[in-house]
């Protein structure tokens, strides 16, 4: 999953809190769900979408290896073992060297048995600059991309020559211009294709303004363990009501986060319950018995505007011992460090609260 985070910022959203839920409370539901939805591209699917065979062929023929591809397999294995042994202990921290190089998602030793090349055909035969000064090249790098890192992108742009422009797109994972909810990287590509001669004059300041990935703080198992929302002016609800507000907002935010992974229009809550989605670019969600915590249900509707980021919701949260709240909430999903506002009634008392947008 750490590897997959390089192409899926949803892993960054959930992983820390999900790991702590297992380690601190023996609660594996969040981590198991994250693993289930974080299926790497070449784990399954049609070859027309992604060819694992073509990938390994390119990897073994074009990529530099930790051993000599012209050597016999036995010699390669010895060279590879020596290369691994020479790595510093913290090369893949917080993972050990052995944990990382033996991970099934990595291919460090994947070419040990690959046939030796029958002729020399390096993918790049020249020396920098690699393109003529009249040929513009746009290089985009995601700030959270650990597969092709932004430092690699910067090096590529330098090797291309002075006609290249490198742009780091903050808070973005692998392949910046596809599935681009903010329209920044995709807009840069479109403007480049339309007017390549204006590459160095294009305003790319949007790349530094992409909002942060809002990480989940906790995955509480029960309502009593949830951090309460912060009371606002006019609030008369007690701690339980404020916890109901926090859980209600978390359930809506969790359903929105799941939208990116749904193969259709139906999804499931973290600990039971269901929700449905329809519409685009205005997404309408309906939650039925969704349990973000095990002992409280969330029912209601939400609207999420993909273009503006505006989220509004009306939900009823029912907890243990008859505790209940009827709530309205709003936040902007595209804001930087956005806050959610929650109003309504809990236990017969007015509730007004704020909390970090889920």
Where are these regions (language model features)?
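Active-site-adjacent alpha-helix of alpha/beta-hydrolase-fold enzymes
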Residues: 150-165, 172
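Acidic/polar loop patches that form or flank catalytic/metal-binding clefts of enzymes
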Residues: 165-168, 197-207
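Alpha/beta-hydrolase fold active-site neighborhood
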Residues: 1-127, 131, 212-215, 219-337
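Histidine-bearing beta->alpha loop at or near hydrolase active sites
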Residues: 170-177
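Post-His helix in hydrolase/transferase enzymes
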Residues: 177-194
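Short beta-strand/loop motif that positions the catalytic acidic residue
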Residues: 132-133, 138-141, 145
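Conserved alpha/beta-hydrolase "acid-adjacent" motif
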Residues: 11, 146-152
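Edge beta-strand at a domain terminus
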Residues: 345-358
């Amino acid at each position: 999953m750490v590897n997959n985070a390089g192409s899926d910022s949803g892993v960054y959203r959930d992983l820390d809190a999900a790991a702590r839920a297992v380690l601190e409370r023996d609660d594996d539901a969040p981590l198991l769900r994250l693993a289930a939805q974080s299926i790497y591209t070449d784990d399954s699917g049609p070859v027309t979408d992604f060819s694992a065979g073509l990938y390994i062929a390119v990897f073994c023929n074009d990529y530099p290896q930790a051993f000599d591809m012209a050597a016999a397999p036995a010699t390669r294995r010895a060279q590879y073992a020596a290369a691994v042994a020479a790595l510093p202990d913290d090369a893949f921290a917080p993972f050990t060297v052995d944990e990382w190089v033996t991970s099934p998602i990595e291919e460090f030793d994947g070419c040990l048995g690959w046939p030796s090349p029958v002729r020399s055909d390096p993918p790049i035969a020249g020396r920098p600059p690699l393109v003529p000064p009249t040929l513009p090249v746009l290089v985009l790098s995601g700030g959270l991309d650990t597969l092709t890192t932004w430092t690699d992108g910067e090096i590529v742009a330098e090797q291309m020559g002075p006609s290249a422009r490198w742009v780091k797109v903050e808070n973005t994972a692998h392949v910046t211009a596809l599935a681009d909810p903010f329209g920044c990287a995709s807009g840069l590509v479109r403007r480049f294709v339309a007017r390549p001669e204006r590459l160095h004059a294009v305003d790319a300041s949007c790349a530094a303004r992409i909002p942060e990935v809002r990480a989940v703080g906790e995955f509480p198992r029960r309502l009593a363990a949830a951090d309460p929302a912060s009371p606002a002016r006019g609030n008369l609800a007690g701690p339980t009501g404020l916890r109901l507000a926090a859980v209600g907002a978390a359930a809506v935010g969790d359903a929105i986060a799941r939208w990116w992974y749904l193969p259709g229009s139906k999804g499931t809550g973290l600990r039971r319950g269901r929700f449905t989605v329809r519409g685009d670019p205005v997404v309408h969600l309906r939650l039925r018995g969704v349990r973000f915590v095990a002992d409280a249900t969330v029912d209601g509707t939400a609207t999420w505007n993909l273009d503006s980021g505006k989220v509004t919701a009306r939900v009823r949260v029912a907890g243990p011992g008859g505790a209940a709240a009827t709530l309205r909430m709003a936040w902007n999903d595209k804001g930087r460090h956005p806050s959610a506002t929650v109003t309504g009634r809990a236990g017969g008392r007015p509730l007004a609260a704020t909390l970090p947008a889920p």
